[in-house]
């Protein structure tokens, strides 16, 4: 009888030890789990950052996965040329080449013929000819006056490669592709002995109400803002400047009670497009009070300070900022490495080890 009790208590002690070990393992795993929330207005580059995480931390895109983007690449290319053609009328710009008017009619009649994600050689030739028209180029230069994908020139300048037989999208083609994010997309990966759970949330106004579900237990927020959007308006409200919307959104996030103890990193994205644009369009179009030089450094720093000045708790909370180009893998790799070090440092601070 006594031996029965003894073996029972041994069994119970063993179970207790196993449970203790499991709880310890769970606690360690939780301590190493980083919940990253990607926030920002629509078309600020959040989804491109997620794609970069797959390239940098998850062995990239297989040939099969790249092939799945072929239809998106063609759709983005077609939507871009259609947007420019439509804007020709709105902005009152004339074609230069005599054939372009006829090509426009052909394009509009063939616009629904992207069957099985392929582009016919005839459609490709029409798009190529139109893109080569100086009138279209003049209209493209005024892209901030209508809605046009950032990737328009990237694809339209490379139509020969994109429409060659046997074309398979490469990683740059995938990074430049644009599909509106609806809902919440989670990506998991490991880096520097941490397990990351990254959440990409749709940025358009209609999507933002879904963010609330992600707020609990967030380690770090990466807020993306497009530097190049200073002379553009929202897709969903053409009365609102995109940069002003981004600042308004950042203000509500960085000063939100939910995020009082959350690390916040600001990605001032699309620095490549900004560098190109700032030589042509003065920053005062967005910030009338700005009288400084219209250089990448001066205008870029001014925008950065507009965001950082919104932080009402500067003495308690530091906001880290980086200028980024989300389509540049090396740049994102370097910046994300720095972000991870910030997360590690903040975690050690929380544990009293820093």
Swiss-Prot record:
GO terms for biological process: adenylate cyclase-modulating G protein-coupled receptor signaling pathway; detection of light stimulus involved in visual perception; G protein-coupled receptor signaling pathway; phototransduction, visible light; response to nicotine; sensory perception of bitter taste; sensory perception of sweet taste; sensory perception of taste. GO terms for molecular function: G protein-coupled receptor binding; G-protein beta/gamma-subunit complex binding; GTP binding; GTPase activity; metal ion binding. InterPro entries: Gprotein_alpha_I, Gprotein_alpha_su, GproteinA_insert, P-loop_NTPase. PROSITE patterns: G_ALPHA. A lipid is attached at residue 2 (N-myristoyl glycine). Residues 8-27 have a biased composition (Basic and acidic residues). Mg(2+) binds at residues 47, 181. GTP binds at residues 40-47, 175-181, 200-204, 269-272, 326. Transmembrane segments: none annotated. Keywords: Cytoplasm, GTP-binding, Lipoprotein, Magnesium, Metal-binding, Myristate, Nucleotide-binding, Sensory transduction, Taste, Transducer, Vision. Its main location: cytoplasm. Residues 1-27 are annotated as: Disordered. Residues 324-329 are annotated as: G5 motif. Expressed in taste buds (sensory organs of clustered epithelial cells) of the circumvallate, foliate and fungiform papillae of the tongue, as well as in nasoincisor, palatal and epiglottal taste buds at protein level. Expressed in enteroendocrine of the gut, in the lumenal pole of a subset of brush cells lining the stomach and the intestine at protein level. Detected in solitary cells throughout the respiratory track. Expressed also in spermatozoa. It is found in: Cytoplasm. Residues 32-354 form the G-alpha domain. PANTHER family: GTP-BINDING PROTEIN ALPHA SUBUNIT, GUANINE NUCLEOTIDE-BINDING PROTEIN G(T) SUBUNIT ALPHA-3. Transgenic expression of GNAT3 restores responsiveness of GNAT3 deficient mice to both bitter and sweet compounds, whereas expression of mutated Gly-352 transgene do not. Furthermore, in wild-type mice, this mutated transgene acts as a dominant-negative by inhibition of endogenous GNAT3 interactions with taste receptors. G proteins are composed of 3 units; alpha, beta and gamma, respectively GNAT3, GNB1 and GNG13 for Gustducin heterotrimer for bitter taste transduction. The alpha chain contains the guanine nucleotide binding site. Component of the TAS2R14-GNAT3 complex, consisting of TAS2R14, GNAT3, GNB1 and GNG2; within the complex interacts with TAS2R14; this complex plays a role in the perception of bitterness. Gustducin heterotrimer may also be composed of GNAT3, GNB3 and GNG13. This is Guanine nucleotide-binding protein G(t) subunit alpha-3.
